[in-house]
Design a protein with these regions (language model features):
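Histidine-anchored nucleotide/phosphate-binding helix
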Residues: 1-7
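Active-site phosphate/pyrophosphate-binding segments
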Residues: 11, 24-130
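Short internal beta-strands
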Residues: 16-19
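Gly/His-enriched, cation/cofactor- and phosphate-binding structural elements
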Residues: 133
Length: 133
């Protein structure tokens, strides 16, 4: 119903699901969501799949869900460790009027010509990289 209701039955819904995922050392019985299954079900803008890694982005994606003039299911995949990670913080300014949802978050590092690789990360991988550096 979640992915096909609009196409099959012309029924829209604004269901919001927060599905924590990732093993994070706990084993497969602790992983409650499979991103790849939802990605396979995405077709013709039938659902919104998000992976909000900051409180501000989570706020904006929920606000956007309520304020839009149409309804689509929103599935937010978030690793459990990000719910309490010390680097996963936002200011009120990032949630204030004039701020918006960011599809991508980027590092504000300076451009260096010797850089030959760029890494795109999701989930809490960026926190591992920042801790490594």
């Amino acid at each position: 119903f979640i992915t096909s209701a609009e196409y099959k039955w012309r029924r829209s819904n604004g269901l919001v699901m927060l599905l924590p995922h990732g093993y994070e050392g706990q084993g497969p019985e602790h992983s409650s969501a499979r991103i790849e299954r939802f990605l396979e079900a995405c077709a013709n803008d039938n659902i919104q799949l998000a992976n909000c890694t900051t409180p501000a982005n989570y706020f904006h994606v929920l606000r956007r869900q309520v304020k839009r003039n149409f309804r689509k299911p929103l599935i937010n995949m978030s690793p459990k460790s990000l719910l309490r990670h010390k680097l996963c913080v936002s200011t009120f300014k990032e949630m204030a009027t004039g701020s918006d949802f960011h599809r991508l978050l980027w590092d504000d590092a300076e451009f260096r010509p010797e850089v030959t690789n760029i890494k795109l990360c999701s989930d809490n991988k960026i926190n591992h990289i920042l801790n490594f550096n």
